[in-house]
Amino acid sequence: MSAPGTAVPTEWRRAFDQCMLDLLRGRPRVVQTSALALQGLCQQARAQHTQSEPQVRMFWVLAGHFFDHLNQAPAPSPWQNWHTVVCARIMAAAPGLAPMAPTPNQQAEALSAMFLEFVHAQVEYWQSVMQRWADAPQDAGAAHECLGPTAQLHMLLGDMQLDGMTDLCAALLHCIEAALAHSDLAAGAERAAPAVPEMLRLLHQYAAGFVRSPDPSLVAVLRHQPV
């Protein structure tokens, strides 16, 4: 892998282009094998850009998480319109991959667009899963289904170094796990419910250029250990 803005190795570029083509040709379904290969290629790029500008590193972090999201989707999984938008952003502005070297402003704009499309989609899905538990607070299956999306969101936000939202996710994971372990489902659902609007508040503030911490009293409630 090369420095941002320079030509990437032919073998890597050929593999990336071929996997992306296979992924897009697979529509209207998600091709998990192509997504897995693209995730690996993004991880290679991320490892080679540890000393690069922050937006370059974060570009590959988000791209890797996006392809991991596609790979983890249940098969067969329908292709979404926002998937196409993110793929187009990656192809057009990936440092060292685009036909012409992107400027720092272009990289920042692409990163912002990827964030708005991908992270918001992740949060919306997580919100829908959490709502199913809120609607059926005694349902252990509904509570258990919250674990995967919450853990995936926690990993994504942690890699993006969004500490406040990461801390909120960690506390929520503790709440869900404790509710399942102690058969405290209804009380756990009640404690977990405020985490959704709090996450949306933090997300909107981040999109507006602010980084805020979650309500400490809410984090304490989520970390409460049932007796």
What name fits each language-model region?
Residues 1-227:
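Extended, low-complexity, amphipathic alpha-helical coiled-coil/linker regions that act as scaffolds
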